[in-house]
């Protein structure tokens, strides 16, 4: 039997062994094959990374912005050249199908492209005359060492909306990727190095609690970007803020989709199937609840269940597979527990994800509950799995009121051709990202990404202009030039 490879941290431009003696298996969730082992690193590892990044910041922050942008452009080119390999790594680590993995790679590349626009993004502004012979100018500067804590569900896209922008703007970076999906990160490092990145600018430390707390507490780390669950995200925001760091924390979701009587049902059902069961439901933009008007509810449910029954489940590397596994055995058990809870609390199970799935990996099939109510656990909790709840409503107003009862407010979608309904939805729904006649309202990199309420803690969102503000600080220079006598 071949020896399982143990991964190393990437610090100061080198792959270095962690100080830990604790390693965890990285498993292909579709086959249960052990791919490698990842170190559960120590505070000592974070200390080394933070000091390295702080030292590198002294020179990297002074590098001309166009030169930094050229390195990001080189990185974008290399990512594009290796997109199939990157997608393959995502599929074997995360489980999503090849098409979805390629889509994620594309979104990651898009974020790098946006970051490569740093010369424009870093520009300040000025006013030639604020008083007699006095002018003022506003300059942007990098903030320092930044820490990023990324989840397993988008191992390329999420880190790529963190470190490329931060680095392009002159910061140095320490990434803690998910210990469940480290191989993709290893490839990103390899390509970024080839793009010309100097030592110490980008560092990777694998791990769990000690690494997270090290990032939250180290005085050299000035800002933290987090994506993950609500309990951890709330802790990250509180602890980071307590230590006087700038923090953005993108957390849980329970996204509602509203279907009105005038919706094109074929198109609507196709979009909802993709939104609810794509990436095995393990995404913060997944459709978790559908509220459908009573007039079309029966027809909608018939089409929805039929479409769900046609979904091909299996290894994401196999042709035609749409739904891959959830990430680990614990996630599967948790999901099965929610299915049982839904039955016990009175929801009607119309598509049972426990049936017709193999035990070879951590598979759960498309699961649909009808006649769900807002007092049920499956409506309240973020399940993060291919489980969809359906509620029948009288009208749009009731649907919006139901959605607004959720503690989460990441995204919401509406299917209709009625412009008045669209306006009402836009003005009254509590959510940060809205979709009209589409299933997943994730915006492009140049728009901010994140929600409201318990889906986000902080003031500046990821991506868009918010990300530029998050990773920079401003310096205002007011200058007086006494009028010369040129006579």
Swiss-Prot record:
Protein's UniProt keywords contain Secreted: no
Family matches, as CDD domains: ALDH_F6_MMSDH
Catalysed reaction, written as an equation: 3-oxopropanoate + NAD(+) + CoA + H2O = hydrogencarbonate + acetyl-CoA + NADH + H(+); 2-methyl-3-oxopropanoate + NAD(+) + CoA + H2O = propanoyl-CoA + hydrogencarbonate + NADH + H(+)
Keyword annotations from UniProtKB, A to Z: NAD, Oxidoreductase
Keyword Oxidoreductase applies: yes
Pfam families assigned: Aldedh
GO molecular function, one term: malonate-semialdehyde dehydrogenase (acetylating) activity
Listed pathway(s): Polyol metabolism; myo-inositol degradation into acetyl-CoA; acetyl-CoA from myo-inositol: step 7/7
Gene Ontology biological-process entries: inositol catabolic process; thymine catabolic process; valine catabolic process
Residues forming the catalytic site: 284 (nucleophile)
Binding locations of NAD(+): 150, 152, 176, 179-180, 229, 251, 382
InterPro entries reported in the protein's UniProt record: Ald_DH/histidinol_DH (IPR016161), Ald_DH_C (IPR016163), Ald_DH_CS_CYS (IPR016160), Ald_DH_N (IPR016162), Aldehyde_DH_dom (IPR015590), MeMal-semiAld_DH (IPR010061), MSDH_GmP_bac (IPR023510)
Enzyme Commission identifier(s): 1.2.1.27
Taxonomic superkingdom: Bacteria
PROSITE patterns given in the database record: ALDEHYDE_DEHYDR_CYS
HAMAP family in the record: IolA
Function: Catalyzes the oxidation of malonate semialdehyde (MSA) and methylmalonate semialdehyde (MMSA) into acetyl-CoA and propanoyl-CoA, respectively. Is involved in a myo-inositol catabolic pathway. Bicarbonate, and not CO2, is the end-product of the enzymatic reaction.
Family: Belongs to the aldehyde dehydrogenase family. IolA subfamily.
Assembly notes: Homotetramer.
Protein name from the UniProt record: Malonate-semialdehyde dehydrogenase 2
Species: Bacillus licheniformis (strain ATCC 14580 / DSM 13 / JCM 2505 / CCUG 7422 / NBRC 12200 / NCIMB 9375 / NCTC 10341 / NRRL NRS-1264 / Gibson 46)
Lineage: Bacteria, Bacillati, Bacillota, Bacilli, Bacillales
Gene that produces this protein: iolA2
